[in-house]
């Protein structure tokens, strides 16, 4: 494969960026403005503050979360790293449920199970945006699903099961 060189006979490869066929985003790709209506998300704690920033749009019953793919979010191929997508999805789904359900709006929702189907890459500079909906809320569990797009193109489908935990600190759910 162009852009890779074999490291050893066991089949491990080393990425060689100088020979890569990947396209590079324009220099201003990660400084493009966030879409109108989005504002910085305050919730999430130190982990999200370090790995974000994430933005939220909340208008009526529409709740969307998003972020711009920065170089620090990318894999060696120049696309959003799957781990960052998983982090985003793990914030998207429970926080969407908080905003769409009075039953659990102030409760911590630790993840029991998170299923992500990666549909397409999200390149450097892309605006990644997601929406999620609660499917069912029981006495102790929340079932929810969502869709994530990159510049409007579906890039991940997510579903999750979350435990209804104790009342959460205010900055964890807002």
Summary of predicted features, one role per range:
Residues 3, 13-174:
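Terminal targeting signals and extreme-terminal segments of soluble enzymes
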